[in-house]
């Protein structure tokens, strides 16, 4: 299968890429900055890198039409108070672009929210799930807590 991996330069994306390749998939890695992402030599034969910023609709034209599945690992970090709107815009632009492809299944890695989560955070994450769920593909939502591991910062 040909898989689109958004957030490929992030903590989860870097660890998911080799697993996908080892399982026989061709992976298209979406990164905002080509200079900040290097594919390990042993994965290069099954990997392509495209520069995509989900806040820039023109950059979405580089997403191939013949992809079978996608992982949505986009997390927008900002000091700005409107980062929740930016996250929603990314999700909307992703869904719009993916609906123009052959994708049959999208996997979204969301947050596991609890009673201590703010209502604003809870609502914004749920809105992203709803937005992604409006696509013409099947959607799997994985909710996890904060992930910390080797190399995270």
Regions found by a protein language model. Give the residues of each.
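Structural signature of beta-strand start/N-cap positions in the alpha/beta core
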Residues: 2, 26, 48, 105, ...
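Conserved hydrophobic beta-strands of the Rossmann-like cofactor-binding core
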Residues: 3-5, 70, 106
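Conserved glycine-rich Rossmann-like NAD(P)H-binding loop of the short-chain dehydrogenase/reductase
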Residues: 25-32
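The conserved SAM/SAH-binding core of class I Rossmann-like methyltransferase domains
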Residues: 30, 73, 142
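NAD(P)H-binding glycine-rich loop region in Rossmannoid oxidoreductase-like domains
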Residues: 35-101, 112-115
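Glycine-/Pro-rich loop/turn segments that contact NAD(P) or position catalytic residues
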Residues: 76-153
